[in-house]
Curated annotation (Swiss-Prot):
Pfam families: COX2, COX2_TM. Mg(2+) binds at residue 196. It is found in: Mitochondrion inner membrane. It catalyses: 4 Fe(II)-[cytochrome c] + O2 + 8 H(+)(in) = 4 Fe(III)-[cytochrome c] + 2 H2O + 4 H(+)(out). This is Cytochrome c oxidase subunit 2. Keywords: Copper, Electron transport, Magnesium, Membrane, Metal-binding, Mitochondrion, Mitochondrion inner membrane, Respiratory chain, Translocase, Transmembrane, Transmembrane helix, Transport. The gene is COII. It comes from Apis florea. InterPro entries: CcO_II, CcO_II-like_C, CcO_II_C, Copper_CuA, Cupredoxin, Cyt_c_oxidase_su2, Cyt_c_oxidase_su2_TM_dom, Cyt_c_oxidase_su2_TM_sf. GO terms for biological process: ATP synthesis coupled electron transport. The chain crosses the membrane at residues 26-47, 63-82. Coiled coil: none annotated. Residues 1-25, 83-225 are mitochondrial intermembrane. GO terms for cellular component: mitochondrial inner membrane.
Length: 225
């Protein structure tokens, strides 16, 4: 989860989040290199003696500044597309979880387990011995290290189901079903919030995901049934 003075990503807890962080680092290295080169050229132009003052054209330079940006864009493009398809492609999920956005709370369904269904509301301030605006009365429970399918939609306006540490952000659109892969690589409790402005209480739509062992998950399913 986010903390004060945190300027980087949250600690990644899924393969997708790892890939996104690595991609971000690669892009930032490219941006820093380009920025450094640009600043150097600017200072060099100010400090030189105008030795190329009457240079009107140079085909070699023009070819270089056309090819180099194309190569840089391709270097950025291919990893980006790979991550995009990895997140969107559903490969043999163990089961599906349906997340439905409402104004201003979430509901969850487990269709493969006797249609378990429950609502998830933000806890009141008076209940706080926990994290402000992030704790919910019911958590979405998932088994760790098992590929799942998250299906999301909405009953009213557009919401967005987002858990940064899992590398997940998917819009919940009324009348439409979106899906993506969901997998956690370690046990823990992960926090998120609705990331699409959806009305007056948009800021009070927290998401709480608990990743547990498969044995504990099945015990929870048994109790819910």
């Amino acid at each position: 989860m986010s903390t004060w003075m945190m300027f980087m990503f949250q600690e990644s807890n899924s393969l997708y989040a790892d890939n996104l962080v690595s991609f971000h680092n690669m892009v930032m290295i490219i941006v820093i290199m380009i920025s450094t080169l640009t600043v150097y050229i600017i200072f060099d132009l100010f400090l030189n003696k105008f030795s190329n003052l009457y240079l009107l054209k140079n085909h070699n330079i023009e070819i270089i500044w056309m090819i180099v940006p194309i190569v840089i864009l391709l270097i950025i493009c291919f990893p980006s597309l790979k991550i995009l398809y990895l997140i969107d492609e559903i490969v043999n999920p163990f089961f599906s979880i349906k997340s439905i956005g409402h104004q201003w709370y979430w509901s969850y369904e487990y269709p493969e387990f006797n249609n378990i269904e429950f609502y998830s509301y933000m806890l009141n301030y008076s209940d706080l011995n926990q994290f402000r605006l992030l704790e919910t009365d019911n958590r979405m429970i998932i088994p760790m290290k098992i590929p799942l399918r998250l299906i999301t939609t909405s009953t009213d306006v557009i919401h967005s189901w987002t858990v940064p540490s899992l590398g997940i952000k998917v819009d919940a659109v009324p009348g439409r079903i979106n899906q993506l892969n969901l997998i956690s690589k370690r046990p823990g409790i992960f926090f998120g919030q609705c990331s699409e402005i959806c009305g007056m209480n948009h800021s009070f739509m927290p998401i709480m995901v608990e990743s547990t062992s498969f044995k504990y998950f099945m015990n929870w399913i048994y109790k819910m049934n």
